[in-house]
C-alpha cells in the first residue's frame, strides 16, 4: 500500500447553484416579484455578513451560460451550518422561482505532502507555519470580481494511477506544479477543498480573479504540468461575476451589475483569506508558494508568490493594478484594519498600508545601514519569506539623492504582514521616519518605468520635486529605486497633514504628471497612503 499523507480538516464549503425559472418570473405579479427580491436580498445580506454563524464567509455570483444563473458560496465551521444556510434559502419567496441544478460539498483540508514535520510535531513548528496552516483551514472569499469553479479528481487508471505512486514522487510532481502557479501571483486567489466521501469528485477548486482571462490562463497552463496531464480528471466548469446582495433585483431585470462601483466584500467574522486547502491535493504541492516553510513570518503564508505550500494548482495570490490617486484613495486606507496594522507596526518604525483597490498589505522600513549590509540581511529573510504563499515581494530600495534605504515587504494578508514586521524590524540601523516630523506619509508604490524612459522619468521627478518644495505642508520627497531592478521605483513623500498631500494630488501639475506617466510606465502606478 502506498504511503498516505496525514490530513487535517477545517471549514466546510457549499457551492449552491440556482437556476431561475424565467417564465414564472416574468408571469408573476409585481408585488410577488418585489417580495421575492426583498427577502432574497435579506437572505444574501444576512449570510454575507455572517449573521447566521460565529465565523465563515459567503458571496453570491451571477453565473454565465446555461448551467446555472446564480451561485451562492458558503464557508462555515460546521456541516450543520452549511445545511442550515441551504435550507434557509428555501424558505425565501425568491427560492420559489429557482431550482437547484447542482451543488458541491467539500471541506478545507491540509496535508503532510510538503510539511510532514508539522503533522509529526505541530508544537515544534514555528508560529508562522502554524498561522499559515490555520489560514488554509479557514479560508475567506476574497474581494475579486469573478469566480470560477470546477471539481476534479486524481486518475486511478490502468496506466496512470496516482494512488499507486510513491509519496516522494507525488510530492515532487506537486512541487513542480506549484512553480507554475507562482507566475500568477497578484492575479489569482484560489481555494481548494477536499470532497472525498462528500461529493462525486475528490476536490472542489474555486478560483477568484479580477480578470476572468487569468482564470482561463492558469487552468490552461497547468494542464501541461505532469501532475495534471497524466493524473488530472476534471468535472464541469462554471464562471460567474460577483455582485452585492442589493443588486439582486437589477440582476433579475437584466441590468448591468454591480449597479455602482463598490467593494463587494461584505463584512465577515473572519480575517484575510489564506489560500487554498486540501489534502492529497489535486494540484501542485505549493500552489505557487513553495513547498516547505522556513522559519518565517507567517500569519498566512508567504511564498514567492502565488499560493500556499500545501498542494495547489493555482495561485493563492492577489493584488490588482489599480491606482487613481484621487481623494477616494484616502478613505481606502482609513478603515479599521489599516489603522490597526499601522498602529501595531509603528512600534517597529515600520510604515504600513494597503494599496488602493488591492488585496495586499505593504510594510515599509527605513534604514541608514549600507546598501550591501541591508541587502545581505534582506536576502536571508527573503529566503524564508518565499516559503509562504502570501508573500508577494520583499526588496531593498535606495534613495536617489540622499543616504536612506527602504525595505518594502508586500503580503497578501494583514496577519502575514504583521508577523513579517517582527522580522524586518530587526534589520540594522532602522530609523524612524517620523523623526523628520510627524505628519502624513504617502508612497506611490510600484512605478515600473519602461527602460527607455528611465532617464526622462528621473528628470520629471526632479521637476516635480521642485514644485513640491514650494508647497505648503511638504516636508520631504524621495525617489526610491530597487537595487535589483532600476526600473522599479516608488516615491516616498512626507507631509504635515493629509490635506496638504491631497492639495497636491488635486493640482493640475499632478494631473499632468500622471497623464505623462501613462506613456513611460509599463503598468499603472499603485498608491499606498500611510497616515
Curated annotation (Swiss-Prot):
SUPFAM superfamilies attached to this UniProt entry: Dimeric alpha+beta barrel
GO molecular function, one term: heme binding
Superkingdom assignment: Archaea
Binding of heme, residues: 177
Annotated Low complexity bias: 318-338
Region listing for Disordered, in residue ranges: 269-340
Keywords, alphabetical: Heme, Iron, Metal-binding
Name of the molecule in the record: Putative heme-binding protein HQ_1094A
Biased composition (Gly residues): 284-306
Biased composition (Basic and acidic residues): 271-281, 308-317
Cross-referenced InterPro entries: ABM_dom, ChdC/CLD, Dimeric_a/b-barrel
Family designation: In the N-terminal section; belongs to the ChdC family.
Listed PANTHER family: COPROHEME DECARBOXYLASE (PTHR36843:SF1), HEME-DEPENDENT PEROXIDASE YWFI-RELATED (PTHR36843)
Residues of the ABM domain: 441-529
Pfam family, one: ABM
Species in which this protein is naturally found: Haloquadratum walsbyi (strain DSM 16790 / HBSQ001)
Amino acid at each position: 500500500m502506498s504511503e498516505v499523507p496525514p490530513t487535517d480538516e477545517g471549514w466546510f464549503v457549499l457551492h449552491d447553484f440556482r437556476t431561475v425559472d424565467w417564465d414564472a418570473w416574468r408571469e408573476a405579479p409585481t408585488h410577488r416579484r418585489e417580495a421575492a427580491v426583498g427577502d432574497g436580498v435579506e437572505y444574501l445580506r444576512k449570510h454575507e455578513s455572517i449573521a447566521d454563524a460565529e465565523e465563515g464567509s459567503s458571496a453570491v455570483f451571477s453565473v454565465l451560460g446555461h448551467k446555472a444563473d446564480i451561485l451562492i458560496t458558503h464557508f462555515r465551521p460546521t456541516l450543520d451550518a452549511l445545511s442550515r444556510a441551504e435550507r434557509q434559502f428555501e424558505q425565501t419567496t425568491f427560492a420559489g422561482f429557482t431550482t437547484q441544478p447542482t451543488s458541491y460539498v467539500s471541506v478545507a483540508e491540509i496535508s503532510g505532502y510538503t510539511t510532514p514535520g508539522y503533522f509529526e510535531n505541530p508544537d515544534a513548528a514555528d508560529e508562522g507555519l502554524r498561522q499559515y496552516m490555520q489560514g488554509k483551514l479557514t479560508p475567506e472569499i476574497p474581494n475579486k470580481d469573478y469566480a470560477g469553479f470546477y471539481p476534479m479528481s486524481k486518475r486511478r487508471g490502468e496506466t496512470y494511477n496516482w494512488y499507486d505512486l510513491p509519496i516522494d514522487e507525488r510530492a515532487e510532481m506537486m512541487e513542480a506544479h506549484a512553480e507554475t502557479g507562482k507566475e500568477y501571483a497578484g492575479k489569482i486567489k484560489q481555494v481548494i477543498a477536499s470532497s472525498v466521501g462528500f461529493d462525486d469528485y475528490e476536490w472542489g477548486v474555486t478560483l477568484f480573479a479580477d480578470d476572468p482571462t487569468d482564470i482561463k490562463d492558469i487552468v490552461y497552463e497547468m494542464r501541461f504540468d505532469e501532475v495534471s496531464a497524466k493524473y488530472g480528471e476534471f468535472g464541469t466548469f462554471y464562471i460567474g461575476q460577483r455582485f452585492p446582495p442589493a443588486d439582486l433585483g437589477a440582476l433579475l431585470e437584466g441590468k448591468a451589475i454591480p449597479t455602482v462601483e463598490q467593494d463587494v466584500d461584505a463584512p465577515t467574522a473572519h480575517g484575510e483569506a489564506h489560500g487554498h486547502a486540501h489534502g492529497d491535493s489535486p494540484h501542485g504541492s505549493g500552489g505557487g508558494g513553495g513547498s516547505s516553510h522556513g522559519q518565517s513570518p507567517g500569519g498566512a503564508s508567504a511564498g514567492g508568490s502565488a499560493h500556499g505550500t500545501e498542494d495547489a494548482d493555482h495561485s493563492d495570490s492577489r493584488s490588482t493594478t489599480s491606482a487613481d490617486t484621487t481623494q477616494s484613495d484616502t478613505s481606502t486606507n482609513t478603515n479599521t484594519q489599516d489603522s490597526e496594522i499601522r498602529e501595531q507596526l509603528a512600534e517597529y518604525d515600520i510604515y504600513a498600508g494597503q494599496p488602493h483597490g488591492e488585496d495586499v498589505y505593504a510594510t515599509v522600513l527605513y534604514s541608514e545601514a549600507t546598501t550591501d549590509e541591508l541587502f545581505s540581511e534582506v536576502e536571508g529573510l527573503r529566503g524564508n519569506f518565499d516559503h509562504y504563499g502570501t508573500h508577494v515581494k520583499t526588496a531593498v530600495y535606495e534613495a536617489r539623492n540622499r543616504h536612506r534605504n527602504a525595505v518594502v515587504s508586500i503580503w497578501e494578508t494583514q496577519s502575514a504582514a504583521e508577523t513579517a514586521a517582527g522580522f524586518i524590524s530587526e534589520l540594522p540601523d532602522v530609523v524612524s521616519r517620523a523623526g523628520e516630523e510627524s505628519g502624513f506619509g504617502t508612497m506611490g508604490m510600484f512605478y515600473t518605468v519602461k527602460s527607455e524612459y528611465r532617464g526622462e522619468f528621473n528628470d520629471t521627478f526632479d521637476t516635480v520635486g521642485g514644485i513640491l518644495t514650494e508647497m505648503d505642508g511638504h516636508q520631504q520627497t524621495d525617489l526610491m529605486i530597487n537595487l535589483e531592478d532600476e526600473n522599479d521605483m516608488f516615491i516616498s513623500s512626507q507631509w504635515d497633514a493629509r490635506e496638504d498631500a491631497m492639495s497636491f494630488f488635486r493640482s493640475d501639475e499632478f494631473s499632468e504628471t500622471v497623464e505623462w506617466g501613462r506613456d513611460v510606465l509599463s503598468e499603472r502606478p499603485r498608491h499606498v497612503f500611510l497616515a
